[in-house]
């Protein structure tokens, strides 16, 4: 059976998948599976209750994401540990969601996934990632906006094999926010350097050139 996390028969039906949901998950993701979750780890993730999904009141799954523990030796958690994010192996990282093109509840889904992850890992840190796709910047900006609107904070932009860069988000914000230091676009070459200096983005705006991240420091 599927564990029900939250249910609204009209719009939202978030559930933690078990192995019984493997076929439904495969129908949503196709042969590629969930991003950054190696195919040979999917069965284990289902058995361990590490995949959250939403039917959104439909017969088929509409969205899904995996929560990978940082001690895992898969490429994603390994690269995060190497970059200093959860270097002790405690905590977890939420993979980018796969969703039906008509799915409209992404922000709600992300909030639910973060709440579930935070409860599951208690005091440990929760991260989320998003590949930077310069060649499809509007879609990348839209997903980043959904992440930030769901309560995530952009903390880093790191190189990662197979991507143009990996945006790294934290479920925790800075304790005290100062006034905005700078506004940057996702494709600005200065973004990674500013984030490395300890600045972070939890909010954004829209300008003539697209999404503008408001970079702030902790006071």
PLM features per residue range, with description:
Residues 1-55, 180-184:
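Short amphipathic alpha-helix that is part of the acyltransferase structural core
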Residues 3-6, 101-102, 128, 132-219:
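Intrinsically disordered, low-complexity, positively biased terminal segments
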Residues 35, 43-53, 60-98, 159-161:
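Conserved acyl-donor/pantetheine-binding loop and adjacent beta-alpha core of acyl/acetyltransferases
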Residues 55-58, 115-123:
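Secondary-structure boundary elements
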Residues 90-94, 118-138:
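Conserved GNAT acetyl-CoA-binding A-motif
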Residues 91-95, 99-119, 141-142:
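Conserved acetyl-CoA-binding loop-helix of GNAT-fold acetyltransferases
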């Amino acid at each position: 059976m599927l564990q029900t996390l939250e249910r609204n028969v009209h719009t939202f039906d978030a559930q933690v998948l078990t192995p019984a949901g493997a076929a439904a998950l495969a129908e949503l993701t196709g042969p590629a599976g969930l991003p950054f979750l190696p195919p040979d780890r999917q069965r284990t993730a289902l058995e361990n209750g590490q995949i959250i999904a939403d039917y959104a009141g439909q017969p088929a799954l509409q969205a899904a994401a995996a929560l990978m523990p940082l001690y895992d030796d898969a490429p994603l958690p390994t690269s995060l540990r190497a970059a200093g994010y959860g270097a002790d192996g405690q905590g977890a990282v939420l993979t980018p969601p796969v969703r039906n093109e008509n799915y409209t509840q992404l922000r709600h889904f992300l909030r639910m996934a973060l709440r579930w992850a935070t409860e599951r890992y208690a005091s440990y840190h929760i991260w989320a990632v998003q590949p930077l796709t310069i060649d499809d910047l509007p879609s990348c900006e839209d997903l980043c906006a959904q992440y930030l609107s769901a309560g995530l904070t952009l903390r880093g932009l790191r190189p990662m094999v197979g991507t143009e860069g990996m945006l790294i988000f934290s479920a925790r914000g800075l304790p005290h926010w100062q006034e905005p230091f700078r506004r940057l676009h996702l494709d600005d070459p200065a973004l990674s350097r500013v984030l490395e200096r300890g600045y972070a983005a939890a909010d954004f705006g829209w300008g003539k050139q697209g999404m503008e991240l408001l970079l702030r420091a902790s006071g």
